Amino acid sequence: MPEPVLQSIPARLLSHTPLRSIVLALFLATPLAIAASPQNPPATLDSELFEVTVPQLESLYTSHAVTVTQVVEWHLARIRRFNPIYRAVQTVERKEALQQAATLDRQLASGHLPAWPARGLLWGVPIVTKANTSIADQITTDGWRGYMLPGHELLAPRDSTLVARLRAAGAVFLGITNMPDFAASDTNRSSAYGRTGNAYDVRFSPGGSSGGTVTAVTSNYAVLGNGTDTGNSIRMPSATSSVVGYFPTRGLVSIAGIAPLDWLLDNTGPIARNVTDAAIALSAMTGMTAADPAPKADPLDPRTADAAQKAQPGLYTQYLRPGALRGKRFGVPAFILLGSGIPFQGIPAVVPEKSAAEEEQDAVLPLRDSTRKAFLAALDGLRAAGATIVFDDSILPPTFARIVSRAGTMPYVAEGTDQFLKLFGPAQYHSVADYKRATGQPLPDTIVNPTLERKDEPKQSQMQIETDPAAQANYFRPRQLALDQYDATLDRLHLDGYVYPATQMPPPDETMPQSYAHTGGISGTISEGPHSDTSWVNILGVPAIVVPGGFYPNGLPFGLEISARRWRDGDLLGWAFAYEQVTHHRHPPTLVQQGLLPNMP
């Protein structure tokens, strides 16, 4: 297993340094697990491997221009060089990655390896995985120290379905990326491994909870990674870092073996530097192969049972056409422009109306002027590719947001945590109750009994959703009403999908106190942003994608989000590809090797 090397704050920084700088030092010098790697590979590989795509990499392998070992070592060297500053990767799997690379090199040298993609959609492709995604014999930290207690570690007994499918596709696992505790934050600070910085400016937030993966991928630590998304956690951080983040139709990709935040909302999907790589990775994540290009059901995730019948057929790369946007129509949701807001996890029907109204008001997220300008500018790329943008106050108005907000999932959270521990927990604990018996402390309410933000609101009783008589009123009925309105609006206005900003604000500077979004007051605390108004996608389970949409005046990225009807994932990827080919908005970050304070390690 990887051996972590811990770094602490240099004592010299604590004696003659202004308070603001000490706070920043705390961010930049929190514990981090990194492993030694060899000397940097020859610089001549930079031109071949920097920003390399999956098809380009496979071509290099086919022509024997590089070996898998060289490619893996090049990426490991970038992690060693830059990760101490950005802290995107919590654990490096150097030994395992090089062993796998050597095995693949022997296959390549044998002369009997099939051509790509028959040899595996991701054959020899370096990837990273998020810390809530189970890998056999590795600790699934879920970003939380409590799963790392000596003698009580959450050591995965087997791979998650996602990891098993990526292995089968030939991917090489380089490391595990940082994430906030339980994926329950809009930023990327973890009790287990500290803070991840934005690759475009380390002072700023990369967003969360997949901020570690997006920082690793945009920084060329790996070609691809996986993210998870309960309320925006693939899409929002992708927007901050000029990468492509994909939220599949729920049920297309299995979440079995991924530590849940809220199993009714959770999803997983690819994070990549371009749409083509995202489409290839998504195909692999569904269990597709070149010989059998159909999504596979996973017995451990019943929501995948009908994927093969409902999904668009074939590998998703076949939908990537430069002209895919011609004649398409996209509506802009009115409630997002108005900043109506949707409380995360919704509000169960059993919550009193007064408390529900107060919670809805607290969720208001005004769209910042700079984000509105960036969004309107990004729409020009859609128009240039042949699409029409429709603004209409009846397109998902604030009443839609209110319907969605009443699809409450909080009473059913513990059910998902229990199911995960039953199948992917260590020998010591296979349930919420087992964890308390084994460690002497309970699991936090976040994953066993969440409540509304208001401190005076009592916790909801945890129930099994299949047997709870209130489940229809709490969740199923409002979700279906919102989904019906989503589809009916598309039909009424002859729309193909929706387009909107992936966040309500630019990435915040985490070295400065932040203002509350809904009051304008100063909180005096570090950021919990950039905030997003896109958790409705999770409740509905429709597919959505974030693509690079340009940059703010300060040089930080803006992300454009597009959503489609359920199971139209191929169409959605095609639209994103067409937008990408017209705009070419992505520009990689310029990374630094020094901290923001003198002599920082």
Where does each model-flagged region fall?
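N-terminal secretory signal peptides that target proteins for export/translocation
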Residues: M1-T17
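Bacterial N-terminal signal peptides
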Residues: P18-A33
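Gly/Ser-rich catalytic/binding loops embedded in alpha/beta enzyme cores
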Residues: N40-G231, T249, R273, M285, ...
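Short helix-loop capping/hinge segments that flank enzyme active sites or metal/cofactor-binding pockets
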Residues: L45, W116-A118, L122-P150, G327-E359, ...
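Glycine-rich, small-residue loops and helix-cap segments
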Residues: H64, G124, K130, A168, ...
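Acyltransferase
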Residues: V72-E73, A102, Y316, L365-S394, ...
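Structural helix-boundary/capping segments
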Residues: R81, V172, T218-E358, L376, ...
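Flexible glycine/proline-enriched surface loops and loop-helix/loop-strand junctions
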Residues: R145-M148, T196-A199, S209, I258-N267, ...
